[in-house]
Amino acid sequence: MTDSFPDASKRLYGRRKGRPLRKRKTELLDTLLPALEIPVPQPGERIDPHALFPKPVRDVWLEVGFGSGHHMAWQAANNPDVGVVGAEPFINGVAGLLKLVADEGVQDNVRVLPDDARPLLDALPDQSIGRAFVLFADPWPKKRHWERRFIGPANLPRLARVLKDGAELRLASDDMGLVRWMLEHTVRHPDFEWTARGPSDWRHRSEDWPPTRYEEKAIEAGRKPVFLRFIRKPRG
């Protein structure tokens, strides 16, 4: 794969591929991915997210950087009337999601962009997404890389545009530097409202927010994840 974003120097992710894939995952990249894949949108292109799915869906949710796919597959399996779209440039993560999708039988309400999420966000209509997730994103800890963090001045307006009024934006991280960064930028953004009323609101997930493998590893290593929920304020 090549970088789809016009300026590859501004990419928000690291490597494209890690360890060699097992045979089944390699086969799923060849057989299942073509059925679920969203082609990288071209500049100026518009995509109706509801039209991506073979059956009508009541809502469309978006996960940016779905990792190995556990959260996304869970949401698809537990919300069969919702179309779940995910963007992930790391091919091993895409292969992991495909295995879960095949095992759960949720091909009809999952669609995948195996690439940078930003061209997709730019192609979506206003108020077309009912919920968005950015969970355990790369913290880019070095100061010179902070502008690569997905949640920030460049992408919050993108999310605000595509999210419906009252839609939820869910963020999570075990890196306190990134948590502070996300809070600082999202709380200051005029289109988002933080829903927390006390510490328990950001220390615990709700029942419809499943744990991920990364989260479990973080807890085992002694790190405490933080869970943030924001609402897209009504327009006008």
Report the location of each language-model feature.
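S-adenosyl-L-methionine
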Residues: 1-62, 70-77
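SAM cofactor-binding core of SAM-dependent methyltransferases
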Residues: 59-122
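A short acidic, Gly/Pro-enriched loop at the edge of an enzyme's catalytic core
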Residues: 122-131, 136
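Class I S-adenosylmethionine-dependent transferase superfamily signal
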Residues: 132, 159-160, 169, 182
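Conserved class I S-adenosyl-L-methionine
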Residues: 145, 172-189
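A short glycine-rich, Lys/Arg-flanked "PGG" loop and its adjoining helix->strand segment in the class I
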Residues: 151-165
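Conserved beta-strand signature within the Rossmann-like core of class I S-adenosyl-L-methionine
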Residues: 165-173
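Class I S-adenosyl-L-methionine
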Residues: 184-236
